[in-house]
Design a protein with these regions (language model features):
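Gram-negative bacterial Sec-dependent N-terminal signal peptides
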Residues: 1-20
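Sequence/structural signature of beta-propeller domains
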Residues: 21-385
């Protein structure tokens, strides 16, 4: 039986300013039913008679209780891949199963055990999608060169998604986010894609989807949207994983990454700055967001992580207050993007970033994995990661 370790934290008491009590944690090994694997029939199939493990946990959503069982929705990312040598200036990746479709799954936690069940491939009217990088001529391209397991070059695919977060859409389906575009994707409960939103193309640009601010195209490659959550008022808040790299000049300097608000009913957007822990990192581009989850219409929980100046991983959960945060949309002008401003200049321009308070250090609770990518709120005192 294939297994993937996902620590599930319980008994983490939240008080919105500091922990009311010392948090505790329980860890579960998530198992998969016999036969649940990524099919692999490539050149080296004999070495993998049971296929490849399924990598869940790129997003996590608490969906309720069924008797004494806790249930969660989760999503995989773009599928099995491996680094390979650069081709000129371009990064390359080996996609051992290029036809892999990201999976929507359910996790059940009951009687001290956790199991991932009911895999549903993401698909559209043309059939199953895949996780391949986009073509090089569209917004959202990472300029990665994709290779097969035998190092044959693969074409970019504009139906490729690198899915990360998951949140309900209020209609029985879900919103997902993606690291490529970056994209917001609305799906039904069976994994069918209903709508996609991405950075709106400017003159002379080519886009797969629109409706989101054009500036988001400057996300660092493979660091697009990393987590999202639905607010009680129906807005979707989605986090850009790391600092934007505007004109390839701002990623190391920017003091914040962006939180994007999207109203599915009206299409209205807004953007807020989440202040990263700049002093902790060798460079600001090392900071990464892992996931977010809503507390109310103005407060979210957020995982900030990355290697610090001493090359040690840090995985922290913060409560983020958006009440006084400025909408950055009105400040985004060529040559005046806030990503290039220091604290003094931000203040002089009247730009206020979100406020934040540390809730818990996951490392202090025994978190061992490099990254935490799924965050779910079970109740007012309990989180799952």
């Amino acid at each position: 039986m294939k297994r993937k370790i996902i620590p599930v934290l319980i008994g983490c008491t939240l008080s919105f300013s500091a922990l009311a009590a010392q948090p505790t944690a329980e860890r579960y090994v998530v198992s998969f039913p016999e036969g649940t694997h990524v099919n692999y029939a490539g050149a080296f199939a004999s070495a993998f008679p049971n296929g490849l493990p399924v990598g869940i946990g790129s997003g996590l959503l608490f969906t309720g209780k069924q008797g004494d069982a806790l249930t969660f929705a989760t999503i995989t990312d773009r599928g099995p891949n491996a680094d390979s040598p650069k081709e000129g200036k371009n990064e390359t990746k080996i996609f051992v199963t290029p036809d892999f479709a990201p999976l929507l799954m359910t996790i059940r936690v009951q009687n001290g055990k956790a199991e991932a069940i009911d895999p549903r491939p993401l698909h559209d009217d043309k059939g199953a999608i895949n996780g391949l990088p986009l073509a090089s001529d569209v917004i959202g391209s990472t300029n990665e060169v994709a290779f097969s397991d035998t190092l044959h070059r693969l074409k970019g695919d504009n139906r490729g998604l690198d899915t990360e977060g998951i949140t309900p859409d209020g209609k029985g389906g879900y919103w997902l986010c993606d690291e490529y575009g970056p994209f917001l994707i609305n799906i039904d409960s069976k994994g069918k894609i209903l709508a996609i939103h991405g950075p709106q193309a400017a003159e002379g640009e080519k886009a797969i989807a629109g409706g989101l601010p054009n500036i988001l195209k400057w996300r660092q490659a493979n660091r697009g949207f990393e987590g999202l959550t639905r607010m009680p008022d129906g807005r979707i808040i989605v986090a850009v994983q790391s600092t934007l790299d505007i004109d390839a000049k701002s990623k190391k300097k920017a003091l914040f990454t962006r939180l994007v608000s999207f109203d599915p009913a009206s299409g209205k957007t807004a953007m807020y700055g989440y202040p990263i822990d700049s002093a902790a990192y060798s460079k600001n581009s090392d900071a990464k967001i892992g996931d977010i989850v809503a507390l109310d219409n103005q407060h979210i929980l957020l995982i900030e992580q990355g290697r610090d100046k001493n090359n040690r991983m840090r995985n922290l959960i913060y409560e983020v207050d958006l009440n006084k945060a400025s909408d950055l949309s009105g400040f985004d002008k060529p040559g005046e993007y806030p990503e290039f401003d220091d604290e003094k200049t931000l203040s002089q321009r009247g730009i206020t970033l979100a406020q934040k308070t540390q809730v818990v250090d996951l490392r202090s609770l025994g978190w061992q994995q490099e990254k935490a990518e799924g965050l779910a709120l079970i109740d007012s005192k309990t989180l799952a990661v």
